[in-house]
Amino acid sequence: MPTLHLLCGKIASGKSTLASTLSAEHAAMRLSEDPWLAQLYPGEILSVADYLRCAQRIRGVLGPLVVGLLESGVNVVLDFPANTLANRQWLLGLAQAAGVPHCLHYLELDDDTCRARLHARNAHGEHDFAATDAEFDLITRHFCVPSEEEGLVIEVHRS
């Protein structure tokens, strides 16, 4: 039976790197939010409000695609941040709609480690988006640690 793999972690915690690993390990289709946003909305995402508006549009199209892939027997790794209760409810709903199991991979790293990785990532210039320290702080304030009480199967990663 196919599985939906979800990712939860602060900015620069390693979600996309883990998504690539999981995709290879599970012969899964990997769908990543950042490249979609960068390609569909070049130069339009200048604030968190812009991100939320554009991300919501993508999710409206992506949801049925993910459910269809899962129903067709394809493992899926969604490199979309499952960092808030609302996001996790939407993502979990995709697995439920397809009638398949899920696994939420939680990258548990402290803010200092993530911020250092963000600075290194920004210096290399290879990521679709370069968050500032202020954006990191703003987005991190909304981060909510996942809980099994949400109906989630959680695998914790600490590196």
Residue ranges and their predicted role:
Residues A28-R30, H102-Y106, G151-V156:
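Conserved beta-strand scaffold positions in the cores of enzyme catalytic domains, especially
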Residues I45, Q96-C144:
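A glycine- and Lys/Arg-enriched "phosphate-lid" helix/loop adjacent to the NTP-binding pocket
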Residues L4:
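Walker A (P-loop) ATP-phosphate-binding motif of ABC ATPase nucleotide-binding domains
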Residues S13-V74, A120:
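Conserved substrate/cofactor phosphate-moiety recognition/catalytic segment
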Residues R53-H102:
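Glycine-rich phosphate-binding loop used to anchor ATP phosphates in small-molecule kinases
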Residues E25, T140-S159:
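NTP-dependent small-molecule kinase module
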Residues L7:
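Hydrophobic anchor at the beta1->P-loop junction of P-loop NTPases
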Residues K10:
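P-loop (Walker A) phosphate-binding loop of NTP-binding proteins
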